[in-house]
Structure formats: structure tokens, C-alpha cells
């Protein structure tokens, strides 16, 4: 038997996880946020069940504040790959006018993402949900299992999780409970980019450097993606050469100065990077809005 490369081992582990969930859960779903990790997850899911399509739908929780290029890419991928795409919006949040500019990152994220996700999981009665989180991203994710148990309220209790020895997973849940499943847990950001390069996986163009209209605000370069973003006194829109390491709601996602215009350039950039990709996410900036608190409330 030939020795597997590092990326082949990661790929094999992820495919095993996909198949384990398909075999043991009655109604799984994949959370499709449209970022680079979701693109890798989609690719792995297609591989895991080829030539059949993935035996589960793909769910996008739309906050109505995603980059326009993300939504265009999402719809194009669904048409091209032929997977079942479910889009859920927290309509009550929309009626209440919840948004990142009017209510801040914490309230917006909780209402439009966390509550929206809980609504969708309850509506369709999913008992397992794939997510693209990785342990290298953030400290609370570093201690999360691949099969992350959630209670009937979708909450995560890090003290009430199950051992995962020898890649044997406990998939039993009672009525109303569910499991969040993270096939990319052991991948790093560099692994993701090297795999995207190796497999030639399509990704949102925002990951590549280009001249974009940005405003420097609260220590971040925020892209002006539509007319809902109002300038503060003294702010000016500049066309700067930037790209994004992570994607989310555009008012809460900071760009980085970069000239990496192709996948090889991005991999080279990652080899010397000394900061986390999460530095560009406003929702991780303070303790009150910490990732662990959000996950306990039912966040991804």
C-alpha cells in the first residue's frame, strides 16, 4: 500500500466522516456559507458519494448582508453542481430592521445568523449538520469534537461532549437533539489553500487581490458593497489592492492589503502569515461577542 500524503490523509478522514453521517443519521444537512471552507466541503462531499450526488441538501443561512459576489457564486454553484440548495432568512429579523450598522455585530449575528440557523434546523428537523469549522481558527473551536453534540435548544456545552478514540464516533441522539459535524477539524488554513490549489476548486473571487472600494473603520478595511453603508464624518472611500482571507457579512469583514491574485500567490502568502484569518472578523473582537458564547447559543 502506498503511503498517503498529508493532504490525502486529511481528505480520507473527511470523506470517512461524510459517509459515517450519511449512514447513521436520518436527516443530515450541510451548512453552506459559500466561503473557502464550504467550497472544500462541497468538493469533498461530491467525491465521497460519486457518481451519486450528496444524499443531503445544502443550507445557506442568508443574513441579507453577505457580499453580492458570494450570493452570485452560491447560485452559480448550485446550478452547475446540481445540489439541493435551501436558503433561509430570519424574516422576523428583517421586519425588525436588524442590521450590523443599526444594531451592532453582536445583536446582528445572534438574530440573523444564530437564531436564523436554529429556525432552519427546527423547520426541516435536521438531526446532523455539517460545518466547515477548523480547530486552528479560534480557541473555542480548538477544543470542539469532530462530532459536536448539541442539546434540544441547539446549545453547545464543552463539558458534555463525547470521546472520539480510534475514529469511532457516537452518533446517537435523542428526539430534538442534534450533532454538528466538522470534517475539516484537523485542517489548517494552509491545508485548505493547498488543497484548493491541488484540486482546482472554484472559490469566490473576493479571495483574490483586486482594486476594491474600501473604507478604513475601527482598524479594519471595510469594502463598500452597496448603498446601505453610510460614511462617517472624515471617512473616504479608497480604491485599494486588497483581498479577503475570510468572508461573511460585508460590514463585519475586513480586507487585507495583498497582491495575491492567484492560488499559488495565496499559498505563498500563507506560508509567511503570522496572524489568524479571524483577525478580519468584527464578531470576534470582544469578550462579550466571543465565539464560545455564540456557540453555546447555537452558532455554527
Swiss-Prot record:
Pathway: Sulfur metabolism; hydrogen sulfide biosynthesis; sulfite from sulfate: step 1/3
Group of enzyme by EC: transferase
Record's catalysed reaction(s): sulfate + ATP + H(+) = adenosine 5'-phosphosulfate + diphosphate
Pfam families recorded: PAPS_reduct
Molecular function in Gene Ontology: ATP binding; sulfate adenylyltransferase (ATP) activity
EC number in record: 2.7.7.4
Subunit annotation: Heterodimer composed of CysD, the smaller subunit, and CysN.
Function field: With CysN forms the ATP sulfurylase (ATPS) that catalyzes the adenylation of sulfate producing adenosine 5'-phosphosulfate (APS) and diphosphate, the first enzymatic step in sulfur assimilation pathway. APS synthesis involves the formation of a high-energy phosphoric-sulfuric acid anhydride bond driven by GTP hydrolysis by CysN coupled to ATP hydrolysis by CysD.
HAMAP family: Sulf_adenylyltr_sub2
Protein name: Sulfate adenylyltransferase subunit 2
Gene encoding the protein: cysD
Amino acid at each position: 500500500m502506498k503511503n498517503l500524503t498529508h493532504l490525502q490523509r486529511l481528505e480520507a478522514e473527511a470523506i470517512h466522516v461524510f459517509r459515517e453521517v450519511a449512514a447513521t443519521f436520518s436527516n443530515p444537512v450541510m451548512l453552506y456559507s459559500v466561503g473557502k471552507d464550504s467550497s472544500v466541503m462541497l468538493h469533498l462531499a461530491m467525491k465521497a458519494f460519486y457518481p451519486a450526488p450528496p444524499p443531503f441538501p445544502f443550507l445557506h443561512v442568508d443574513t441579507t448582508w453577505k457580499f453580492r459576489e458570494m450570493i452570485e457564486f452560491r447560485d452559480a454553484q448550485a446550478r452547475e453542481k446540481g445540489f439541493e440548495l435551501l436558503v433561509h432568512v430570519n424574516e422576523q429579523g428583517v421586519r425588525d430592521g436588524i442590521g450590523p450598522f443599526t444594531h451592532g455585530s453582536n445583536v446582528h449575528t445572534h438574530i440573523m445568523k444564530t437564531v436564523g440557523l436554529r429556525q432552519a434546523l427546527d423547520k426541516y428537523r435536521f438531526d446532523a449538520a455539517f460545518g466547515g469549522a477548523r480547530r486552528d481558527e479560534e480557541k473555542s473551536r480548538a477544543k470542539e469534537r469532530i462530532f459536536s453534540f448539541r442539546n434540544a435548544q441547539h446549545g453547545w456545552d464543552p463539558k458534555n461532549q463525547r470521546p472520539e478514540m480510534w475514529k469511532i464516533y457516537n452518533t446517537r441522539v435523542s428526539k430534538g437533539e442534534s450533532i454538528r459535524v466538522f470534517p475539516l477539524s484537523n485542517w489548517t488554513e494552509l491545508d485548505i489553500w493547498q488543497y484548493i490549489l491541488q484540486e482546482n476548486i472554484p472559490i469566490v473571487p473576493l479571495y483574490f487581490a483586486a482594486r476594491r472600494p474600501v473604507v478604513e473603520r475601527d482598524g479594519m478595511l471595510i469594502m463598500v458593497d452597496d448603498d446601505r453603508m453610510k460614511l462617517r464624518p472624515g471617512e473616504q472611500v479608497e480604491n485599494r489592492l486588497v483581498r479577503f482571507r475570510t468572508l461573511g457579512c460585508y460590514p463585519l469583514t475586513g480586507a487585507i492589503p495583498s497582491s495575491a491574485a492567484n492560488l499559488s500567490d495565496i499559498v505563498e502568502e500563507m506560508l509567511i502569515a503570522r496572524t489568524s484569518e479571524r483577525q478580519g472578523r468584527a464578531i470576534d473582537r470582544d469578550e462579550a461577542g466571543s465565539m464560545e458564547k455564540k456557540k453555546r447559543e447555537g452558532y455554527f
